[in-house]
Amino acid sequence: MADRFENDAGTVTQVKPEKKLKRPRLFRVLLHNDDYTTREFVVLVLHHVFHLDEQSAIRIMLHVHNNGVGVAGVFTREVAETKIEKVETMAREQEFPLRLTMEPEEEDA
């Protein structure tokens, strides 16, 4: 419903309330450990595709290596899908079975 305002000259102006924009849903991109993909390759993709500094990339790679899975980053759906596709293409070219998945972030109540 629009608010109505009348000025001194009798002109009526209607102002529509601003629509609240919803934040897009975010997704975690998960890296899964395997016995064949090298640690160096995982660090490379974390650095080049996910734009992490070397220390952060190494920390995440070690977490994935030790725990089986780890979060590479949190993105909107389209960005997450694009990053997964890019990494999987790079892995295939190097004949690595590196697997990535994505899952929705928990929404704030």
Feature locations, PLM:
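Terminal domain-initiation and capping elements
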Residues: 1-109
